[in-house]
Structure formats: structure tokens, C-alpha cells
UniProtKB/Swiss-Prot annotation:
The keyword RNA-binding applies. PROSITE patterns: RIBOSOMAL_S14. NCBIfam families: PRK08881.1 (NF006477). InterPro entries: Ribosomal_uS14, Ribosomal_uS14_bac/plastid, Ribosomal_uS14_CS. This is Small ribosomal subunit protein uS14.
Length: 100
């Protein structure tokens, strides 16, 4: 299980991403449409002024039950270990063990 501080840090990142999403998207659109290099430089500086953790690339998918960061299935939000346990116990409707 991941440390509680890591889980809370990830939650904080998620809140920051949501808070600055509109502003960041507007600046990036302005950056893409800017013609002169000086304008691009100015806009780039504005983007750099935003909090580092407000960038979506810093977000890490984590299991909502254990906080595990690797082997997380997006469809369920669970790590592979928990997914396997719950599937065997029949706690995930529609999930069956494959056989051929």
C-alpha cells in the first residue's frame, strides 16, 4: 500500500489540474496561434508562471483502494492485484475469467 502522503499529494495535483485547466488551455491555444517568436516567448513565460503540479502530465493514475501507482487498469481504477482478487470473488459484475 502506498504512503498516505503520496495519495494525498496525487489528490492535490488533481485539484490543481482542474483549477488551472482553462487558463492553461487558453495560454496553450494562444501559444499555438502566435506568429512572432517574441510573442511565443512571452506566452511561454506566462505558462511557466503556473504551478508545476497543474500540468496534466504530472498526474499519475493510482489505485483508489491501495494507492498503487503501477499496474492500474483505467476502466476500474484498480491495481492488477485488487482487480484479480475482486474478479475471483465475483465483486466486479460482468468480469469473467477467460478460457479457450
Amino acid at each position: 500500500m502506498a504512503k498516505k502522503s503520496m495519495i494525498e499529494r496525487e489528490k492535490k495535483r488533481t485539484r490543481l489540474i482542474e483549477k488551472y485547466a482553462d487558463k492553461r488551455e487558453a495560454l496553450l491555444e494562444e501559444f499555438r496561434s502566435a506568429a512572432s517568436p517574441l510573442d511565443k516567448l512571452e506566452i511561454h513565460r506566462k505558462i511557466q508562471q503556473l504551478p508545476r503540479n497543474s500540468a496534466p502530465t504530472r498526474h499519475r493514475n493510482r489505485c483508489w483502494l491501495t494507492g498503487r501507482s503501477r499496474g492500474v487498469y483505467r476502466d476500474f481504477g484498480l491495481s492488477r492485484n485488487v482487480l484479480r482478487e475482486w474478479a475471483h470473488e465475483g465483486l466486479l459484475p460482468g468480469v469473467v475469467k477467460s478460457s479457450w
